[in-house]
């Protein structure tokens, strides 16, 4: 992976999504999926409350909005909070190459599995 990538800028996209979720009355967790060069593929936020759907987490929302990719090994998932086991499973299943986590002290989720 390219070490010239601005991970802070990527995290800023995820933070914008978290703020959107909070403004909608939902859980403020955001995520974004980028290609290996830092190009945004998809962004999303937790919509469990808004859609009354327990499966719409920030990571799954960003993943879905990115659309089908040829391969995921060269992608980067950026999330404001450590992925839960469900989202960690998605990351492992599709072999997403790198995960950038904004915060993992209050919730560790499946981070040790990644």
Predicted segments, located by residue:
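Glycine-centered short loops/turns at secondary-structure junctions
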Residues: 25-26, 95
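Short, basic/aromatic recognition patches
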Residues: 2-24
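Residue-level signal for beta-strand positions within conserved beta-sheet cores that form or flank
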Residues: 4, 27, 73
């Amino acid at each position: 992976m390219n070490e010239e990538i601005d991970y802070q800028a990527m995290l800023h996209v995820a933070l914008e999504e978290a703020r959107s979720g909070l403004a909608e009355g939902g859980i403020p967790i955001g995520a974004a999926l980028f290609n290996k060069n830092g190009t945004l593929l998809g962004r999303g936020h937790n919509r469990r409350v808004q859609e009354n759907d327990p499966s719409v987490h920030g990571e799954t929302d960003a993943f879905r909005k990115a659309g089908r990719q040829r391969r995921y090994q060269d992608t980067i998932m950026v999330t404001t909070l450590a992925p839960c086991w469900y989202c960690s499973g998605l990351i492992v299943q599709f072999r997403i190459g790198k995960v950038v986590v904004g915060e993992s002290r209050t919730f560790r989720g499946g981070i040790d599995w990644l």
